[in-house]
């Protein structure tokens, strides 16, 4: 069984083909980073228009990469939310139209379920149950996962997501968009301990997060200490350490609360090397395991949508002829498979 996956929720156009026996057959990705760089962030209208230009050519490229034709595709999966409404509509319209033209089922996929399941694409996939840390530019959530669609929200950010805080702080440090990876690179040159940032909401019970205050703390630290290269690197180091420590503390609490021995982290920020190292160290001490996707599958991509679509298709999920998307879509609303 082969599923074509289409991802257009934000500023990456991702197309992939997944075979339930052979694995990933094709993976095509186009990033709009250069398009939005001059604006310091994603411009929704420009994102939608670029998806219109790139989606069909990338589908053609994926078919060519896999050596398949339309007749070989058994279903079409597309991201139906959450995300930018215009961008979502492009992928949903193309996906639904292809499914109709090819006479195959169309499968709407939840973007964050795609991220959550991305580690399943690796050679050593996690088994249920596990705690999932979904950490990206738009989400920071801790989820109890006992099966496909069996998701319980344990905690989430009450303001900025961790990835958003990375990007905003990077901008304060004069880094280009998207600044998160650049901030991490700068932090590697920083001196640990010169500046100490707070670990938000770790001094009270609960599993919720708050990262907006770290941005303000960074702004004040930059204002009071200047912007020479070493100072900027030291501030970046202090900021990254604060975010990573906060995530680690909350993950530890979630594992203690659930009693689970496995931790899965997914989303763009899960590619952060410092975060990976700290969580791996923590899980080793707890005699547990941590799982994550390869870096290219941490950010938005079509492979995770094709895989999630395969899982949902086998569980009987299909869509009618209508094209509908959900810019806001709580993960807990998904049905169990």
Swiss-Prot record:
CDD domains: ASKHA_NBD_TsaD-like
Keywords: Acyltransferase, Cytoplasm, Iron, Metal-binding, Transferase, tRNA processing
Cellular localization per UniProt: Cytoplasm
InterPro entries: ATPase_NBD (IPR043129), Gcp-like_dom (IPR000905), KAE1/TsaD (IPR017861), Peptidase_M22_CS (IPR017860), TsaD (IPR022450)
A GO biological process held by the record: tRNA threonylcarbamoyladenosine modification
UniProt cofactor note: Binds 1 Fe(2+) ion per subunit.
Cellular component terms per the entry's GO annotation: cytoplasm
Described function: Required for the formation of a threonylcarbamoyl group on adenosine at position 37 (t(6)A37) in tRNAs that read codons beginning with adenine. Is involved in the transfer of the threonylcarbamoyl moiety of threonylcarbamoyl-AMP (TC-AMP) to the N6 group of A37, together with TsaE and TsaB. TsaD likely plays a direct catalytic role in this reaction.
Protein's UniProt name: tRNA N6-adenosine threonylcarbamoyltransferase
Native organism: Escherichia coli O127:H6 (strain E2348/69 / EPEC)
């Amino acid at each position: 069984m082969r599923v074509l996956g289409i991802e257009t929720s934000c500023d990456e156009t991702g197309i992939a083909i997944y075979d339930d026996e052979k694995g990933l057959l094709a993976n095509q990705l186009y990033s709009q980073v250069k398009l939005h760089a001059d604006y310091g962030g994603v411009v929704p209208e420009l994102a939608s228009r670029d998806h219109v230009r790139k989606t069909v050519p990338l589908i053609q490229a994926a078919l060519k990469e896999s050596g398949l034709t339309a007749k070989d595709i058994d279903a079409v999966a597309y991201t139906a939310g959450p995300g930018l409404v215009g961008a979502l509509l492009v992928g949903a319209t193309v996906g639904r139209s292809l499914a109709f033209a090819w006479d195959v089922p169309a499968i709407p996929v939840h973007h964050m379920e795609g991220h959550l399941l991305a580690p399943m694409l690796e050679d050593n996939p996690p088994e249920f149950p596990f705690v999932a840390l979904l950490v990206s530019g738009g989400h920071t959530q801790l989820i109890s996962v006992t099966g496909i669609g069996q998701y319980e929200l344990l905690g989430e950010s009450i303001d900025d997501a961790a990835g958003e805080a990375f990007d905003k702080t990077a901008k304060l440090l004069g880094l280009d968009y998207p600044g998160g990876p650049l901030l991490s690179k700068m932090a590697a040159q920083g001196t640990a301990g010169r500046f100490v940032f707070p670990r938000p909401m770790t001094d009270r019970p609960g599993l919720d997060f708050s990262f907006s205050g770290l941005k303000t703390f960074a702004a004040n630290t930059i204002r009071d200490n200047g912007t020479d290269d070493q100072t900027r690197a030291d501030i970046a180091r202090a900021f990254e350490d604060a975010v990573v420590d906060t995530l680690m503390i909350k993950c530890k609490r979630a594992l203690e609360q659930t009693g689970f021995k496995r931790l899965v982290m997914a989303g763009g920020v899960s590619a952060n090397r410092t975060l990976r190292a700290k969580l791996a160290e923590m899980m080793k001490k707890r005699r547990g395991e941590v799982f994550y996707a390869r870096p290219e599958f941490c950010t938005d991509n079509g492979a995770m949508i094709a895989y999630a679509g395969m899982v949902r298709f086998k569980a009987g999920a299909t869509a009618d002829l209508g094209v509908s998307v959900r810019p806001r879509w709580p993960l807990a609303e998904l049905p169990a498979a």
